[in-house]
Amino acid sequence: MAAVRPARPSSGHPETVLRRRVRMGGEVSAIRLRFLGCGDAFGSGGRMHTCFHVSAPKGQFLIDCGASALIAMRRFGVEPNAIDAILVTHLHGDHFGGIPFVILDAQFVSKRTRPLLIAGPSGIKRAVSGAMEMMFPGSSRVQQRFAIDIVELVPERSQAFKAGVVIAYEVEHPAGEVRLALRTECDGKVIAYSGDTGWTPALVSAAREADLFIAEAYFFNKRLRDHLDFETLRTHLGELSPRRWIVTHMSADMLERLPALGCDYAEDGKVVML
């Protein structure tokens, strides 16, 4: 597997960089996001693990790649070889555990030849290699027929990839050294994702005025340090000011309340056009 390298910094405050690109973009093409999986770690509601597929004019990428990601790609007709990058928020299995399956499929089934970028928090190379060895001993040492570039995202620095730009923000969740929220910009459209986290001011920077903010709402009103609940999220929406927001990563407690809440929520297979 390729050597890990840090993300390269860019000039200017990260939020300013993205806003400037949005304003200068003029007419933009449609961005399509499909929820391949929107469930929690425990399969609440029979939902797949977290994985969002984004199709943009310049490329396709995944935001998180939970353990069931490859199954979901097959189910919803997403071609694995078309994926240019996988962006990872944190190193829990329901958010990155599908990467070994994607790599093995690329090597032995889909016969991938195009390079693949994997970008995530510090320690991601070690985590991916360790997961591969745990599930398929020896697999991390196989010479791939395609290049894998593993990048550590540095909080509050922008990282370019084929489809656009991503900026990571450190959030609160017990998952290794660094846990991230992600703000991506593709062709003038901003998609922000909270990852798993309790409330933190970093979410304001990550989600402010995003075209789409995908936010964890694990519980309805039970407050935890490391998971966001719906009531807390709703309280802070004025600070975030997203153009659209969708809740995801819901426990059974939250799923049972959805019909009465009147909010926009993720479902496996749901498509959002931007």
Residue ranges of predicted features:
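Cap/insert and terminal regions of metallo-dependent hydrolase folds
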Residues: 198-274
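Binuclear metal-dependent hydrolase catalytic cores
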Residues: 13-192, 205, 259-274
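Compositionally biased, low-complexity segments
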Residues: 6-7, 25
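Short beta->alpha connector loops
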Residues: 67-68, 172-175, 197-200, 251-253
